[in-house]
Amino acid sequence: MDRPPVTVLMPVYNGQKHLREAVDGILAQTFPDFEFLVIDDGSTDDTPRILQSLQDARISVIRNDTNAGLAASLNKGIRLARGGLIARMDCDDISLPARLEKQVAFMNANASVGVCGTGAICFGDGKEQRWRHPASDAAIRARLFFGNSIVHSSAMIRRSVLTDNNLGYDESLDCAQDYDLWTRISRHTKLANLDEPLVRYRVHKFGITGTTPEKDDFVTPIRLAQLRRLIPEPSDDEVRAHLNLCESRRVEKRSELADAIGWAHFLQEKNLAAGRPLPEKEFLAELSGRLFAFCRLHTHFGMLAWRNFRKSGLSRSAPMNISQRIRFFAKCLLKYDSSRR
């Protein structure tokens, strides 16, 4: 039997509510030459019946006897995949019709790229928002230092990069498995994002999308592993300053505002001193953007926030237009407290 060029890999656990919509999005793809590998991770709801009713010959359903977890199901799917390209799919998201066609064309034209994501439309909380992530390999690497930069359900992965380097998902993680994999896979291949929304990403009211204490338990060790590339043994104060900047944490002490600004400069200097393991231009842009986001949270400190930001050399590189600068200044002048909206 000929191998299909693409394996669409979708684990599902008790996903009856949105499963059919996710499946229909894949079956409606303009690129038709794929196998659709569905791993039913021991579902106890109506998921097995829905999967059994699917008639498309491209669909293969593998059922786990027990609930093994997302990472284990994904690793199982990677072992079973026949396609040279693995397209990730989640059972509650929706792939737009041209997704596979555009990603396959990009991967075929860029042999050095091992992972390709896309933009996404975030929906499900009563409003829609476009998510844009950096497109180039350099910009993606700069953002990975602070957090995830590829939407998991938009990712297409070259299977050979995984198998040749003995890579897979960390089964000890309950979430952030994708962020962890991207940081490890980036040591072996280039990364890219198509700057076009080709996936609809569903946000759940009670999910762990975004920043929550539960998710931070898994994300923080990944962030600190990235930090140790520049600073092998960071102090507790340095870790605190770093996480404040990564997560745009609202701090209570005015001194912590200055600490975050000083920390951003320190990271820039460390990257230069270490021979630029992170691409200089893109890392500077990412640092300045995160510093602006952090300072913007602290306009209730008044002109202190404005002066600290302005004194920072990074302010000149911050991705903000004149209108944003004026609004930031006005909020500092008025000591606007965003937490009281």
PLM ranges: what are they?
Residues 203-341:
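C-terminal subregions of glycosyltransferases and related glycan-biosynthesis enzymes
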Residues 4-7, 35, 180:
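Cell-envelope/extracellular polymer assembly enzymes that use nucleotide-activated donors
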Residues 98-130:
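Conserved donor NDP-sugar-binding/catalytic core segment of glycosyltransferases
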Residues 40-49, 66, 90:
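A conserved acidic beta->alpha catalytic loop
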Residues 71, 79, 118, 137-245:
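Conserved nucleotide-sugar donor-binding catalytic segment
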Residues 24-33:
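Short, acidic, metal-binding catalytic loop of nucleotide-sugar glycosyltransferases
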